[in-house]
Amino acid sequence: MASEAPSPPRSPPPPTSPEPELAQLRRKVEKLERELRSCKRQVREIEKLLHHTERLYQNAESNNQELRTQVEELSKILQRGRNEDNKKSDVEVQTENHAPWSISDYFYQTYYNDVSLPNKVTELSDQQDQAIETSILNSKDHLQVENDAYPGTDRTENVKYRQVDHFASNSQEPASALATEDTSLEGSSLAESLRAAAEAAVSQTGFSYDENTGLYFDHSTGFYYDSENQLYYDPSTGIYYYCDVESGRYQFHSRVDLQPYPTSSTKQSKDKKLKKKRKDPDSSATNEEKDLNSEDQKAFSVEHTSCNEEENFANMKKKAKIGIHHKNSPPKVTVPTSGNTIESPLHENISNSTSFKDEKIMETDSEPEEGEITDSQTEDSYDEAITSEGNVTAEDSEDEDEDKIWPPCIRVIVIRSPVLQIGSLFIITAVNPATIGREKDMEHTLRIPEVGVSKFHAEIYFDHDLQSYVLVDQGSQNGTIVNGKQILQPKTKCDPYVLEHGDEVKIGETVLSFHIHPGSDTCDGCEPGQVRAHLRLDKKDESFVGPTLSKEEKELERRKELKKIRVKYGLQNTEYEDEKTLKNPKYKDRAGKRREQVGSEGTFQRDDAPASVHSEITDSNKGRKMLEKMGWKKGEGLGKDGGGMKTPIQLQLRRTHAGLGTGKPSSFEDVHLLQNKNKKNWDKARERFTENFPETKPQKDDPGTMPWVKGTLE
């Protein structure tokens, strides 16, 4: 058998191809391409959404613009409808041959810059006289009423007077009066005819001349016009206004003090009118026409004034509240104009006219017939119509004017007091003066029952000359401190001290904070809740950050508290008595006698051997007796079946002041008997004694007291 041929050698393995790496790269590229496509798709969707939102925004803008135009058109239509319902017409009365005033000729443009009154007052009065003369000449034939405005002038420079339809609707009586006047003019002189024609021409402007006051009364606004000073006076508030041509509104000029204040009856009537205004706001227009008609029947003489300030009389109803309170007789008024004062006899004349009207009312105070309209009814209806006119903007403007007219109130907050609650609020108004004192029967506004407060300590009232609240100390015993300064001397009635916002007044031990705000405005410092919350926070901080007391200070505090307790129970004059009961002669100590006669046995003997894990418990042991009664026998384990532990628990010693697990415990046998410090000292003393006195022998220990060690038995 031939030998087998050797097998050919194995070929080396082929080299690894780079295909797997290319495949991985291709997969990564495909994955990135897919992500890129998804990102592009998301970008396209976002662009579509953006275009869609832009279209929606454009549509919304166009819709809003259309709605704005529609609202403007509807508002114009509504305004025209209201004008038609009110039957008002625009009438422009030309009373001058020359061009109207320009802004540069306006009197009040340089009013506050000049020290004295400008010379234009006389020029304006001359122009008014010329205007009246031209109106008289034109009224000889017929009254020329032009409906076209002056050419080439601004709308604000034209003198417009809105004539309400009620001048013609209820004009039966004035028409008959004019007819009688025309018949009487035929036989009268030329001067009387010219005067009557002038009055008839000016009557259409809404002004009537009051002979008693020498001023012109406007029925549309309720103001008196002073032609000399070119000011408008509101008798209900005592404010002088001037007409601003640029804004077309009445601007505040000055104010006079009205004394006395309105009575309670007038306040009640105002409240009733405000209630009517809230209940029936829709009937304002009808009431306005009705009451204006009733007022126009009482107009008896008119003068025409052709100045640009009379342009917006009807709009003034929305700027200031009109009330027929000019029947009250205020004092004589001086109007301040840039340093000089212009005396105006307005209030004297008004008082004379009111007295004349009151006499007339008393004369005709008879029982009215059915359907007859009295003067009081017309005045009340006119006042109700004026107060009921306007909208929310008018009410806001009235509130602002009232806030400016009436002085603010004082909100008094108790900051610190031993008798009053901290954070209490007291309100002081300008109507009645406020008093501060201790007496209970005097009905003080702010009563402080302290010893350091006088019966009538101080008074606070509103000074109309200074236009501020003042504090007057009534000669108190301890005086008054304002802002930490003793400005009010004790026992002397001092001069009035002007109070300002934020002043702190200390009366006795009570500290008061005065807050003065216009209207109903408040701050955090005059709100009782805010003040008490801050005080509570301060108390908490003080309790947490209290100072640490030393040993001596604590002892002083203890003695102080002990004295308080003695004073509380009436023991401040008695000393401390120890065993007061035993010292009582009637007390018998029976327990002491029994101890002396019978004595007492200790259940625990001091010579008992201590327990040990190496010695057996004796039969007299209480624990062993208890176990035997329960069924335990010597040599058995514990438990019901006797399978419990038989050996005692080993004693383990640990280091002092060390917790469990800190170190390895040691048994009792490994620890030597350590002698305490006292025994060591005695041993040292014995050694010294034996060295000094060797002939004496130390006493041996008592053989009965042997230490218990391992292996010892009883």
From Swiss-Prot:
Residue list for modification N-acetylalanine: 2
Superkingdom as given in the UniProt entry: Eukaryota
Residue ranges annotated for the FHA domain, each copy included: 434-487
UniProt biased composition (Polar residues): 335-355
A Pfam family reported for this protein in Swiss-Prot or TrEMBL: OCRE
Impact upon substituting residue 133 to K: Displays a stronger angiogenic activity
Feature: compositional bias, Basic and acidic residues: 279-298, 586-609, 680-690
GO terms, biological process: angiogenesis; cell adhesion; positive regulation of angiogenesis; positive regulation of endothelial cell proliferation; vasculogenesis
InterPro entries referenced in this protein's UniProt entry, alphabetically: AGGF1, AGGF1_OCRE, FHA_dom, G_patch_dom, OCRE, SMAD_FHA_dom_sf
Alphabetized SUPFAM superfamilies for the sequence: SMAD/FHA domain
PROSITE patterns: FHA_DOMAIN, G_PATCH
Gene3D superfamilies attached to this UniProt entry: 2.60.200.20
Keywords: Acetylation, Angiogenesis, Coiled coil, Cytoplasm, Developmental protein, Differentiation, Phosphoprotein, Secreted
Subcellular localization: Cytoplasm; Secreted
Extent of Pro residues compositional bias: 1-18
G-patch domain sequence ranges: 619-665
One GO cellular component, as annotated: perinuclear region of cytoplasm
Acidic residues compositional bias, start-end: 364-383
Expression by tissue: Widely expressed. Expressed in endothelial cells, vascular smooth muscle cells and osteoblasts. Expressed in umbilical vein endothelial cells and microvascular endothelial cells.
Molecular functions per Gene Ontology: identical protein binding; nucleic acid binding
Function, in words: Promotes angiogenesis and the proliferation of endothelial cells. Able to bind to endothelial cells and promote cell proliferation, suggesting that it may act in an autocrine fashion.
Quaternary data: Interacts with the secreted angiogenic factor TNFSF12.
Protein name: Angiogenic factor with G patch and FHA domains 1
Name of the gene this protein is made from: AGGF1
